[in-house]
C-alpha cells in the first residue's frame, strides 16, 4: 500500500485540483485510489452517506475515484465561526468549538483521529492520495502539525510540492519553502509541479533547469492555466463569468462574513442564461430578478452585518418591486422573525430579530442535522436533491406552505403567501437540472435551457486527468505511487 502527498507553497496553489487529477489518472490505470485530507479548514462541506460532514474538495476527489464520500477521507474539518475560533468536526461529527490556542493543545487528539482514518484507508486501497493544507512552511504552525509535514513524517510518505506560477515568484516559493523545512522533510519532497502556466514553455525552461540544479529535485511537469473548469472552489468565491445570452436572469448573492457552502451557486455561474453577481461590503444591492441569501456559519452575526450594510432595506425594496427572494439554510433562518441561540453556539447566548419576511422562528441547537435528501420542489413538482447541514430547528405558521416535499415524508422550508419568497434548508438546490430550471422559471426566466451540472463536473475531471497524462512525468508518478 502506498501513500503519496501533495503539498503546496501557498493556499490556492492547486493542491485540490492536482489531487483530483491524480486520482482520476490513477483510476484510468486500473489502480484503486482513495483521497485523503488530514485537516481541512473550510466553510464549504459535503454530507456523506452515513450523515457525516467532510470538505467539498474531498467529495469531488471521491467522485474522481468513483467512490462515495466517506468521513475517513477528511477526518478533521474546521469550520470558522469567528475571526479567532472554529467548530471542530472529527470523523464527520461536530465535537466542540475552539479558539486557535485551545485547538493547538487539541492537535494531539486530532492527530489520533487522522492516523486512524489513514490506517483504515491504506488497508482498503492500494494508493492513498493525500492533500495538504496551506503551506508546510508556516513557522508558527509547525509545532504539532497534523496537516502537512507532521502527517507525512508520521506515516513516512513521499511529497510532491506544487506552486502557482500565475501569482509570480514561483521559484522563490519553491526554494523558500524547501529551505524552511527540516532535513528529513526536505528529503520527503520528491519533485515539483508548477501550476497555471501561460505562455511558451521554452521561455520557462532555463528556470526549470536552474531549479533542478539548485535543489537536486526533479520538476515533474508544468500544468497550463485552465480558465473554464467547472469544479467547486473550496476557499474563495469564484466570480468568473462566461459568455451569456442576450436575455438573462440577474441573480444577486450578498456575501456576508461567514458565508458557507457558496458552491451552491456554481451551477448558476455556469448557466448561459444567468448573470450571477456576488455583492460585497460597501456595494449596494442593484436591481435584480432574484436575490439569494446564502448559508452562514454565524447567522446572528451575519444578520447584524446585513443590517449594518443597509441590505435589509434593499431586500425590502426588491420585494416591493416584484423581485423574487430565496433563503438557503442560514438564509432561511434570517428570513424569519427571530433566531435564538440559548446555548451560545455562535457566540454570546441570546436572540436576534430576523428580517420578519416569513412567519417562523429558529432555535439553534447543539445537535447538527446532516443528511442527503431527495424530494419534489412544490413550485412545479420538479425533482430535487440536495443535502442538509444545519444546527437550527425552525417552527412557525409559514412552514404550512412548504417549499419541498421530501421523499422521507418530511416537508422542508416555506413559500410566502404571495409566492415571492422561497426558503429551504437544502444545499445543492441548483445542481439538479429539473429543480434549477423550475427555480429560474419561478424567478422570471422564460425558455430555460437545461444544463447537466454533474456531466460538466465529470467532463472536467476527465480533462484534468488528460493534463496529467500530457504534461507530467507519468513514469515518475507511477514510481512514487508504487505502480508498475
Swiss-Prot record:
An annotated GO BP: cobalamin biosynthetic process
Put simply, this protein is called Cobyric acid synthase
Does the UniProt entry include the keyword Transcription?
no
Keywords for this protein: Cobalamin biosynthesis, Glutamine amidotransferase
Is Cytoplasm a UniProt keyword of this protein? no
Family note: Belongs to the CobB/CobQ family. CobQ subfamily.
Q: Which InterPro entries match?
A: Class_I_gatase-like, CobQ/CobB/MinD/ParA_Nub-bd_dom, CobQ_GATase1, CobQ_N, CobQ_synth, GATase_3, P-loop_NTPase
Q: Where is the GATase cobBQ-type domain?
A: 248-435
> Which superkingdom does the taxonomy of this entry point to?
Bacteria
- Please name the CDD domains in this protein's record: CobQ_N (cd05389), GATase1_CobQ (cd01750)
Amino acid at each position: 500500500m502506498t501513500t503519496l502527498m501533495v503539498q503546496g507553497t501557498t493556499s490556492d496553489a492547486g493542491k485540490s485540483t492536482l489531487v483530483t487529477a491524480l486520482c482520476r489518472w490513477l483510476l484510468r490505470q486500473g489502480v484503486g485510489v482513495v483521497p485523503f485530507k488530514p485537516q481541512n479548514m473550510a466553510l464549504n462541506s459535503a454530507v456523506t452517506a452515513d450523515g457525516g460532514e467532510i470538505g467539498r474538495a474531498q467529495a469531488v476527489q471521491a467522485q474522481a475515484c468513483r467512490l462515495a464520500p466517506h468521513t475517513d477521507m477528511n477526518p478533521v474539518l474546521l469550520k470558522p465561526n469567528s475571526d479567532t475560533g472554529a467548530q471542530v468536526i472529527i470523523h464527520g461529527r461536530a465535537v466542540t468549538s475552539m479558539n486557535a490556542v485551545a485547538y493547538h493543545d487539541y492537535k494531539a487528539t486530532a492527530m489520533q483521529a487522522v492516523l486512524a482514518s489513514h490506517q483504515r484507508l491504506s488497508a482498503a486501497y492500494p494508493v492513498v492520495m493525500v492533500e495538504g493544507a496551506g503551506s508546510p512552511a508556516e513557522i508558527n504552525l509547525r509545532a504539532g502539525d497534523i496537516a502537512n509535514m507532521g502527517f507525512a513524517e508520521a506515516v513516512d510518505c513521499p511529497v510532491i510540492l506544487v506552486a502557482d506560477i500565475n501569482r509570480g515568484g514561483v521559484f522563490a516559493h519553491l526554494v523558500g519553502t524547501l529551505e524552511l523545512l527540516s532535513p528529513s522533510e526536505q528529503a520527503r519532497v520528491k519533485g515539483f509541479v508548477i501550476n497555471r502556466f501561460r505562455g511558451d514553455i521554452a521561455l520557462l525552461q532555463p528556470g526549470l533547469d536552474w531549479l533542478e540544479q539548485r535543489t537536486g529535485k526533479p520538476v515533474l511537469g508544468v500544468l497550463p492555466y485552465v480558465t473554464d473548469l467547472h469544479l467547486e472552489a473550496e476557499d474563495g468565491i469564484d466570480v468568473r463569468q462566461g459568455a451569456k445570452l442576450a436575455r438573462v436572469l440577474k441573480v444577486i448573492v450578498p456575501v456576508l462574513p461567514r458565508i458557507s457552502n457558496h458552491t451552491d451557486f456554481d451551477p448558476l455561474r455556469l448557466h448561459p442564461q444567468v448573470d450571477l453577481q456576488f455583492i460585497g461590503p460597501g456595494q449596494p444591492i442593484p436591481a435584480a430578478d432574484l436575490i439569494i441569501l446564502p448559508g452562514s456559519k454565524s447567522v446572528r452575526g451575519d444578520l447584524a452585518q446585513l443590517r449594518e450594510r443597509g441590505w435589509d432595506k434593499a431586500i425590502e425594496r426588491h420585494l416591493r418591486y416584484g423581485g423574487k427572494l430565496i433563503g438557503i439554510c442560514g438564509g432561511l433562518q434570517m428570513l424569519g422573525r427571530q433566531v435564538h441561540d440559548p446555548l451560545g453556539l455562535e457566540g454570546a447566548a441570546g436572540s436576534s430579530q430576523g428580517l420578519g419576511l416569513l412567519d417562523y422562528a429558529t432555535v439553534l441547537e447543539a445537535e447538527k442535522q446532516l443528511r442527503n435528501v431527495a424530494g419534489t420542489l412544490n413550485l412545479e413538482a420538479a425533482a430535487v436533491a440536495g443535502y442538509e447541514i444545519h444546527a437550527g430547528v425552525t417552527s412557525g405558521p409559514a412552514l404550512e406552505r412548504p417549499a419541498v416535499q421530501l421523499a422521507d415524508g418530511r416537508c422542508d422550508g416555506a413559500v410566502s403567501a404571495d409566492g415571492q419568497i422561497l426558503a429551504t434548508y437544502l444545499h445543492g438546490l441548483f445542481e439538479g437540472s429539473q429543480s434549477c430550471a423550475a427555480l429560474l422559471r419561478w424567478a422570471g426566466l422564460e425558455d430555460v435551457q437545461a444544463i447537466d451540472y454533474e456531466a460538466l463536473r465529470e467532463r472536467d475531471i476527465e480533462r484534468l486527468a488528460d493534463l496529467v497524462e500530457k504534461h507530467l512525468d507519468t513514469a515518475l508518478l507511477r514510481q512514487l505511487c508504487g505502480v508498475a
